[in-house]
Structure formats: structure tokens, C-alpha cells
Amino acid sequence: MTLDGIDKALLIWGPMPDEALSYIRSVGWLVIVPEGRPFMTGLKQNAQKLKKAGIKFVYVNDNTLGILFNKGKIFRTIIFYKEKNDTGIIGFCGTMYVTILSRLHNVKIELFAAQALQLAGSVDLLGGKKYILKDNVRDFIVEASDEAVSFKELQ
């Protein structure tokens, strides 16, 4: 699919619970499924669920989100968070990135509790092949971690 083929889209971020499928279906827009590195939650969890449910989606790499926002393709963002507290949420790696892009482009953010991250086997493998750098260079990689996002930042 090309950018011209995307009219109005819903971005989902974080591991989507099954209960969210009916809501996403009711919105009726194309769903943008980012890869969700480093755990590939978009490809390994969300895309599979959407496909099984018959919901139309496109899979994109995380870096493409800036272009989609800039071109006015994303009209709503759903963030599936790990934890909610008095000051905000704890989201998966990249939650702040998606929050900033959504706010910058005046896109409404909705919050839903996430499904537990399902890591079947090594997260270094995709289709049985390594996609993360060799172990001997891990000292040069900034490890992903959960991100705290305040309610102020989410508005």
C-alpha cells in the first residue's frame, strides 16, 4: 500500500488485548500497526490478532510513523499501557515517541490497558533468523525500557 492509499487511519501502540478488537472494528478505519521494537509486538502480536479478526491493517516500521502523522493520515492513537497511576501511565518502549507525535499533530490519544507482552522464544529472532546485532556488540546498544508518560503529556 502507498501513502495515497491511506485515507483515515487509527494507530495502535503496545500489546493489544483481545477485548480491544470490537472497539477497533467499530471505529472502521484502517489500522496502522507499527513493528514495536525491540519486541516486535506489532508483528508478533497485534497484526496476527487483527488478521484473524478480519480487521484491515497495514504494518509499518516504527520510523514511518513520523511520515504518516506529517501527511495527516493518522486521526487517532490508541496506547495500550502497562500500568496507570495518579500521575500518568507506564507504557512500553516508544510510548513517549508516539505521544509526542500525536500531540504535535493534534491527534486524539485514547488509553487502554495492555495485554501482557508475549515473548515466545527469543526476541532476537524473527522468522527463525536473528535480526538484532550479534551478542558481542550488545555493550553498544541502549536497552529498551518501559516509559513513564504523565497525563499532562497525554493531553
Model region roles, listed by residue range:
Residues 41-155:
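Conserved phosphate- and dinucleotide-binding cores of soluble alpha/beta proteins
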Residues 1-56:
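N-terminal active-site beta-alpha-beta segment that forms phosphate/nucleotide-binding
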